[in-house]
Amino acid sequence: MADPDAIYELAQRIESNIEVDKRVAALHSLQSLLESAGHVVEADAVTSAVKVALRHANQALSTASLSFIPTYASMIYSGDATDSHSLLNHNVRMLVNSVGLLVIDKLGDQKERIREAARTALIELGNAAYAISSGHLTTSGKGKETETPLGIFERTLREAGLAAKFARVREQSVLLLPILRQSCEKYPIRPLLSTTVELLLDADATVREGARSTLITLFSSATPAAKADLKKELEKRAVRKQTADAILREVLGAPSAATSAPVLSPPAPTTFAPTTRSQFNSSHGADASIPTSYMKSAPAAGTTFPSMPSASATAAADGIRPVYIASRSDLERTFTTMMPFFENKESEHNWLNREQSMIKIRGLLVSGAHRQFGETLFVAQLKAVQEGILKCISSLRTTLSMHAIHLVQELAMELGDDLAPCVEAFLIHLVGMAGFTKKLIANATQEAAAAIMVNVSFRPLYLQLIWQAFQEKNVATRTAAAEHLCTVLNTHAAHRKHAVESHGGLDLLEKCMRKGVGDSNPAARTKSREAFWIFHRHWAAQANALLNSLDPAIRKQVAALAPSDVETDTIVEQQPKADGGPVRVRPGGASMALIQAKKAAALKAAQERDRKKAEDAAAAHEARVAAARAALAEQQQQQQQVQKHLEQQASVEDFVTPVAANNKKGTGFMPIKNRSLHHPGGQGAGAANLKPATELTVVISPTAHQRIQTAISVPLPTSPTPAVTPNARIKSKNLSQTSWETPPHPRSPGLSPVSARSRAISSSSYSSQGSSSSARMQGAASTPRSNRAPPVTHSTLKADLENLSIDGIDGIDDGEVTADATQQARFATSSRDNGTGEDDTLQMNAPEDASMDLMGMDFNSPFKMPASGGRAVKTQSVLLERQNALDALQQTPQPKSHRTISTSSTSSTNSSTTPASASVRRSGLPRPVSTMHSPSPSASASHISAGHIHAPTTSHRVLSSTPSRRAPTNGVSTALENRAKRLDAQASTASASPAKAKPEVWTWIQALMDGTADLRTFRRLARLSSEFGISATKAADERTEQDDEMVLERGPFSNVAWATKSDGAFSSGLQAWLEGGLFGKLFDGLKRYLCVGDGGGSGELQMSAQVVLLRLVENQFSLFGATDREGELLDVVLQSITLLCGTRTSCVASSSIVAGRAALQGFESILGAWSGRCDPVLGFDALLSRSLSDASTVAVLRSGFTPLLVRLPAQLVLEDFLPRLAPLLTSTLHHASPEKRLTAVTVLRHLNDMVRIDAQDSHTRIFDALGLTIRDDDDQAELKSKRALLDVLMYYFSKN
């Protein structure tokens, strides 16, 4: 029994100011008394003395007090039997409050001895606090809770130890937790978990390592709930992944308090054959035994499989880290967090989360979560995300798809039959991707499908999917089906034979075999034959019957692949020959009579077949002749009816398209669809009765021109010496070609395509007429033109009809016109008197010329031209066109300027004295008429000198270089002759009126005015614009060649609309369109459909109206200036663009947005066409003067200003136009919309590309014009903005 007074006295001595040694001695004496007593007496006095000694600066006294605390703390909570619990609780609380902080501070001491004493003291303090608080965590007094000693100790340790300022104190405090847990098995760690996890992120490495080791030690043997809390806390605090994975690997990999079965990591695979689940179970230490049936399913000899790695191998190859699960709820939470990522379609925002989800599920398999919590729970959670896995398999991102495919493969290997709820969806999806474009994905999917078939028990679905794959057209799918068939038979045929035979399995197998062994692909065929012999090993009878039912060739190939232990001779049955009955064979063989009888029967049968063929051919020929005669009669009847109709309407002037005319400058022929010639000089004086241009069109291909230019560069040894100057060039034009039109590309005088065609016709006509045609030709060479009789056109038409193909006459489409060169009017077959004594015959050089040989022309047959789109030749139109042309040439005299220019170059010395026999050359073709009637050089020279006093124009040079076919008329006055030429040219070049050529155009315009126009109306108007176009090139030629007064029409922007005024009449194409206000009414009608919003019609009609307006701008642009409608056109386009841009920014339906974009693109095209044709200076001023809305800036800059600026000179743009446009460009560059900024940058980039060719430092000058030059007085914000903008512009300038 301890003396309380003695204890109290010793405590007082310790607190007094006596010497340190005496205080230390008193402390030791106090410790001896308490140990001898076995319990604490006067606890308040002792606690106060310990606190004073511990705070003393003397190290000996403080160290002695630290050594005293463990003894005192171990005795303070036990007390005497008479002490109440409340008294003991008070004593412990007081001790912890008094010395707790002081002892924790000693943990940071430099001496290990002191730190060790402090750790011992803290452990005893913690034990005392836990012991006294284990039964009563809280006590209530007057409704108020009091903090327990354990709570005080935990708070002190957390705030002063784990959260201390010194790293050593934090390290020692966290290392103290495992000791506390070891001394007290149920010591609560949860209150300190958050602070301990935070120490994993501490800046000091020793603290981080101490926290890691503490967590591993504390939670290795903790309950699953505690481990789940640790995992959540690690994720919540965003601990470094490597650190967290290492801790979880140690914690979750160790057995918990609720689990005793060890979890081992899977070993690496040791085989390359398809791995079954039994091998994985054994490798993971599972208790399940290996089924013997799986072991019997080893591959047969000679059968190979693709390499199928194990689940752990594929995961290790992809760098998959284990994902540990602490509890069932943690597993459910893991799968639940993935589900939102698989909703909707794959996008840039969710594909990465999907890939991480696939990796996480693979990590679960690596960590063995499916074995830890049971396959049933794991598969149930997997079923919830199965649809997302299928989406990932079908992804176009290769990494995501490969992760998903490997996941399914590993699931099949790890789960086996437990994967049954998910097998059907997985297998159907994987087999269906065998024909995927990416071979890597296709091969991986088939490996995964094979893994399912190997590791999951047999089900009829396997054979059904394989049979469906065999029926696919894709080769890869059929090859994969054959491989799967081998896999299924190798794996399941032995131990699942009854399952295979049920549900029609044998029938499906036979179908697959029969289909596969005869497959066209070698790989699928070979694999199917291997599968057949596996099938034969288990179902020999069915396999033998199947083999004998195959074709002999296939049966032989299948038998060649038989294994060595199979006797194919006993399997394959010898098929008897299918004869009608038994044949009795003579001993000496067949008799001679029998052989002769067989030969005679065979000969008779052959003759009978030939006779039938001849009869059929004759009947077909008669049918064709009858059809040709009927067609000829019908054509003649229609011709008479049309002729009568034309005679009744002789007062109406039709637009004429000559047969061999075109406004194209080229040297070849090509068919044209629905287009007509519309040059100003396209109508002769006698061509009023010809049919419209839509009946026949022949244009000249520029490609052929290049070929002929190459051909004429070859020397022509057989050609005669030309009588004209070497620089003379002629062009291929129609019979009514004006004398002042000159092609931009000169052509060789000997290679006119018109003459080539006429020459081919002439040769065929001469060959068919025989000597009569030769006599006629001789007469033509010696008789003056005025004395010749007019030709008989009826015989010509019949001769032409005989050479025409009548196939497909009934299938002719009026909308598709294709010309045949042999069906043109044959002016060379007979002579015609046109009233002026000039020869209109067109001829071409002989085919022995080198140029014709290079072109590959065949003059022995009619010169056909390919039909466009496979259409038949329009025979009726050609006949009527030729008849009208002949009648017109007979009735109307042709002026000199309209004669057809000869294409033959002949020596002048021989031309006038050519004998009659020379009309036929060595090739059998007639000599060109020009060689028989060419004048002498003196005559030609006199004609040139007399006809032109001043410098001749281009057309005059062409005429002067062309040899005339009659003697010059020296008695005619030169002035009078020139005046007659101009009058004839004006009469022949009067442009055809669209209103007269197409009288129904007024009906179309009225439909526009009434709002009843349909798509056909707009299509016809667009075609009308193309047919009667006004070429800017022709306008320039007319302006150059015409000597009369030039009149400029109104037009503020273009300044190119003009007409030629002569005697009060306009001969240009402008006047033809202005007749009756045609163009103005057409434009007014179009505006009704161009309106954006209400009144504009449907979107389809509005787009059709845009097309017509675009064609008007392209083909009749000068009319807008002539009618003062150019400003109105610009206003309509700009207003429509403004309205459409404003509508696009508002909230409208998606269909309206698409329609609005299409309409906006149409108006931008019209604006771009206007910008490319108007005068750039005037057009820029007009466009800049319009008030532009903010929404339409992009469209106007892109389609309006850019085409105008790039057409201007560089210096003018930099000095004048770009500074005027600078405010608009600068505001657009600073706009918030990226589209507008990019548009402005694009405009400046185009300008820089144009300007830097002619100007140095183009970008500097552009920046100066825009006001972007950096000045000294710029403030900081403005300087920063300018620099950023200059950097962007320089970047785009330097890209090109």
UniProtKB/Swiss-Prot annotation:
Keywords: Cell cycle, Cell division, Coiled coil, Cytoplasm, Cytoskeleton, Microtubule, Mitosis, Nucleus. It holds the Pfam family CLASP_N. Interacts with microtubules. GO terms for cellular component: cytoplasmic microtubule; microtubule organizing center; mitotic spindle; mitotic spindle midzone; nucleus; spindle microtubule. It comes from Mycosarcoma maydis (Corn smut fungus). InterPro entries: ARM-like (IPR011989), ARM-type_fold (IPR016024), CLASP_N_dom (IPR024395), TOG (IPR034085). The lineage of its organism: Eukaryota, Fungi, Dikarya, Basidiomycota, Ustilaginomycotina. Residues 258-287, 735-793, 888-946, 953-972 are annotated as: Disordered. Microtubule binding protein that promotes the stabilization of dynamic microtubules. Required for mitotic spindle formation. This is Protein STU1. Belongs to the CLASP family. Residues 277-287, 953-964 have a biased composition (Polar residues). It is found in: Cytoplasm, Cytoskeleton; Nucleus; Cytoplasm, Cytoskeleton, Spindle.
